[in-house]
Swiss-Prot record:
Region of interest (Disordered), residue spans: 1-21, 62-93
Protein species of origin: Cryptococcus neoformans var. neoformans serotype D (strain JEC21 / ATCC MYA-565)
Transcription as UniProt keyword: no
Protein name: Amino-acid acetyltransferase, mitochondrial
Alphabetical keyword list: Acyltransferase, Amino-acid biosynthesis, Mitochondrion, Transferase, Transit peptide
Ranges of biased composition (kind: Low complexity): 74-85
Catalysis performed (reactions): L-glutamate + acetyl-CoA = N-acetyl-L-glutamate + CoA + H(+)
Length: 602
């Protein structure tokens, strides 16, 4: 029996057929599906590219893994099975960082303020960043804000309703754009915060606004299910009426409530505070209005408030309120937590901050490199904020805790200090010691090459002792948390940066920028892996004759500026690495520093 002949479908037959086959519809559907798949592929590629652009170091990777990596099963076999004839090539070893980035299991919360108003394109870019963070294991708890609305609710009933409708629509927009980027989101229109009544709730009255366990359940359920809760900036008053309040007050209340330990299996302790706005980071007095890169709240909070310029109230109207927000939230969050104030024009900074927990540029790099090089600081450069530690400058051995300093040096260098020899030398030659926190880090500077007799003569054009960086150490538990940058910046302000506007720092015992800058000199073993870090911060270096050491130096910026101005108005010749009047000093440095005895026991 012959198979039935299938009719041929042609355009002519379709015209004659009462119910033609929807060929065009299938084509359109396939085209639509293909377009969606391409959009998903493009977004995945952009996600992976943003991770690569963060350029995490080995320490950054370990830090990320400790917080976001999935737990390792205890029963994984360590032995490699014997190969059999049927075995092919062994599968490549898995990279734990890649697995943690692309397949996160732990969900860590972050508090996020989206400080609009934003256009659809701007808000979509922000929500794409939030979706990428969710893929990396950070679930954003978002509170929407609008700069174009009064911070508190209007007393006029109809105006209050209009304002409430605007922020409600803002929540819906955020959820919509998150969903477009395949990020599960949940609008929370319920009121999670309450305004304390001093008479009925005296314990909560100091907070002003607080979050009860019942209100926190909305956030806990969303985070536990991997959804992004998007909240209104509202709170219940004592009459159980919902009122719009400043978003910062809601975020502060959430930071306090989410950091309180409970028996719930969902850990709500926030790891980050992200403020996404239109004005960028917090402007710096020392950088002529460009943003701070890194803020040590313990040392700089009051100083930044005092030096905030009146004109910045127009260009950065919410900078100080966001600084207060960061200070309040970080007080409740873990030590390793940070806050990021970032413009919507810098979405890649969100990924970089999560993986590295570092600023866009190291704050300890030379100022000229930060403002003149490729990738330099702009108004949109984000500001990273940490709790930090207080910084002190000690100028006598009586102020130094020798036991704590010894413990820091021996722990950092993993060697035994010759205490008697080291401290006897410091009694004679100490210039100053910079201490961060309770000896979490320290920089010890001495004055070398001082006159030993009346016949002593300094080399020409170098009529002063050498400011020598004898020891620079950060405790291992504080490596990677910004302490090293805070320490180096304080060191620069007391030595080669002294006399510059940006050396006016608030550290206890510092010179506050008053004085004349001095060249800073130090040495490091030729095979020291830290030398790469020194190369980036020094003006130059040379190898000693025996090639065991490298001598580094940082030229006094004030003196370099004077030389530059002379060249600029006297023919325009560029400043050389070693000017004529500087010749001979490096040789003298090498001789003097080479005679310094070792601080370590044999």
């Amino acid at each position: 029996m012959k198979p039935p002949i299938r009719p041929q479908v042609t355009l002519r037959s379709l015209k004659r057929t009462p119910n033609p086959t929807p060929v065009v519809c299938h084509v359109r559907q396939r085209h639509h599906e293909s377009k969606i798949l391409q959009e998903i592929k493009d977004e995945d590629n952009a996600f992976i590219l943003s991770i690569l652009q963060a350029s995490p170091s080995a320490r950054d990777s370990r830090s990320y893994l400790s917080s976001f990596a999935p737990p390792q099963p205890a029963d994984i076999a360590t032995a490699t099975p014997a190969a059999t004839p049927s075995d092919g090539a062994q599968p490549p070893a898995q990279n734990p960082l890649v697995n943690a980035l692309l397949n996160p299991i732990l969900r860590r919360p972050a508090l996020v303020k989206i400080q609009g108003p934003f256009t659809d394109a701007q808000l979509e870019s922000i929500c794409r960043g939030m979706a990428h963070l969710q893929k990396l294991g950070l679930v954003s708890v978002i509170v929407v804000d609008r700069d174009d609305l009064p911070s508190t609710e209007s007393s006029d009933r109809y105006e209050a309703q209009r304002q409430r409708a605007i922020v409600r629509h803002e929540v819906e927009r955020v959820v919509h754009f998150l969903s477009r980027h395949r990020a599960a989101a949940r609008p929370v229109f319920s009121t999670v915060a309450r305004i304390a009544d001093p008479e009925l709730e005296p314990e909560e009255a100091q907070k002003g606004v607080f979050v009860e366990e019942e209100g926190l359940d909305h956030v806990r359920r969303a985070v536990g299910e991997g959804e992004i809760p998007v909240l209104l900036p509202v709170a219940l008053d004592s009459g159980c009426r919902s009122r719009r309040i400043p978003a910062n007050r809601v975020l502060l209340a959430l930071a306090s409530a989410m950091s309180t330990h409970t028996s719930s299996p969902v850990d709500l302790t926030p790891r980050r505070l992200l403020v996404i706005n239109r004005e960028g980071g917090i402007p710096s007095y020392a950088r002529q209005g460009l943003p701070h890169l890194y803020i040590n709240l313990a040392s700089e909070f009051s100083y930044i408030n005092r030096t905030f310029q009146p004109q910045w109230n127009d260009s950065h109207p919410t900078a100080l309120s966001n600084l207060f927000l960061a200070n309040g939230c970080l007080a409740h969050m873990p030590r390793e937590a940070s806050a990021l104030i970032v413009s919507h024009r810098s979405p890649a900074a969100l990924i970089a901050n999560l993986i590295t927990n570092k600023p866009a540029h190291s704050a300890s790099l030379p100022h000229a490199l930060l403002v003149e090089s490729e990738g330099r600081i702009t108004r949109d450069t984000p500001t990273l904020i940490r709790k930090g530690l207080p910084v002190r400058v000690l100028r006598s051995m009586e102020e130094v805790d020798q036991d704590k300093l010894t413990h820091l040096l021996e722990t950092s260098f993993k060697r035994t200090l010759d205490r008697e020899g080291f401290y006897n030398r410091l009694k004679n030659d100490l210039d100053f010691v910079i201490v961060i926190g309770d000896y979490a880090g320290a920089a010890v500077c001495t004055l070398e090459g001082k006159p030993v007799s009346d016949s002593f003569a300094y080399p020409p054009n170098h009529p002063e002792p050498i400011c020598y960086l004898d020891k620079f150490a950060v405790h291992p538990s504080h490596q990677g948390d910004g302490t090293v940058d805070f320490l180096w910046v304080a060191l620069r302000d007391e030595t080669y940066g002294l006399g510059q506007l940006d050396a006016s720092n608030p550290s206890i015992g510092s010179l506050r920028g008053v004085g004349r800058g001095r060249d800073l000199v130090w040495r490091s073993r030729s095979d020291n892996p830290v030398n790469k870090w020194y190369y980036e911060r020094s003006s130059g270096f040379l190898k000693t004759r025996d090639e065991k050491w490298k001598v580094f130096w940082c030229d006094a910026e004030q003196r370099l500026g004077e030389i530059w101005r002379e060249r600029e108005f006297g023919g325009g010749r560029l400043v050389r690495v070693v000017e004529k009047e500087e010749k001979g000093r490096v040789k003298w440095w090498e001789e003097v520093i080479g005679a310094i005895p070792s601080a370590w026991s044999a």
